[in-house]
Amino acid sequence: MSSVNVDFEQAGELKIGQVGIANLRIRTLDVPRLVREMQDRVTRAPKLFGRAAVILDFGGLAQAPDLATAKALLDGLRSAGVLPVALAYGTSEIDLLSQQLGIPLLAKFRAQYETAAVRPPQPPPPPHARAEPAAPVARPAPVRMQRNTVRSGQQLYAENCDLTVLSTVGAGAEVIADGSIHIYGTLRGRALAGAQGNPDARIFCRDFHAELVAIAGHYKVLDDVPMDLRGKAVQVWLEQDQIKIAALD
């Protein structure tokens, strides 16, 4: 079984979301390096990243950038071909920075920075007559089934379940699942498994020509896949935050 795992440290980690917005988690305030990395991404996958909406996440830094650095980063990313549209919610400093930059905070990222409130202890319920527990009923895992071809420009989302596609996913099409994805035809478009952050989700495909595959936001584009895996039956999984692809034959 052959596999590929490209492992190198990046100045910014880009994750693909299920709503067409990418989250750029900033690891360093080296603006020229961040801009070069984004230019490289856009060059290698222009249909995916060209004019893509991007959320900037400064949560990985010891402190928020100053206004001049943040403005330079936004201008550089725009020149690289993407569109910074918001900041990920973080601290009061990030809140102030978003106001100074004139761009919003994205509320959906709030949960990444706040711990859940502790529920106060509840009084014990009154005693009831003991009843025999019902025998557990085995429930099959939910699966969404797609029998027809997913054509260019279409997006198919399997919420809270796996997705099985019996036909082809065409170039420019996108299939997304909160669970795993099984494709029994050709995958030429994009497949995003574990869309709500499940790192154990996998992608299985009989004929692999994907523009992009992603699991829990971590992604790999076709240009990063060795030629000997293209056109093969493969599985895709996530290991130590790195996408791995291996032939099934």
UniProtKB/Swiss-Prot annotation:
Gene3D superfamilies: 2.160.20.70, 3.30.70.260. InterPro entries: CAP/MinC_C, MinC, MinC_C_sf, MinC_N, Septum_form_inhib_MinC_C. The keyword Cell division applies. The keyword Cell cycle applies. It comes from the Bacteria. Cell division inhibitor that blocks the formation of polar Z ring septums. Rapidly oscillates between the poles of the cell to destabilize FtsZ filaments that have formed before they mature into polar Z rings. Prevents FtsZ polymerization. PANTHER family: SEPTUM SITE-DETERMINING PROTEIN MINC (PTHR34108:SF1). Belongs to the MinC family. This is Probable septum site-determining protein MinC. It comes from Xanthomonas campestris pv. campestris (strain 8004).
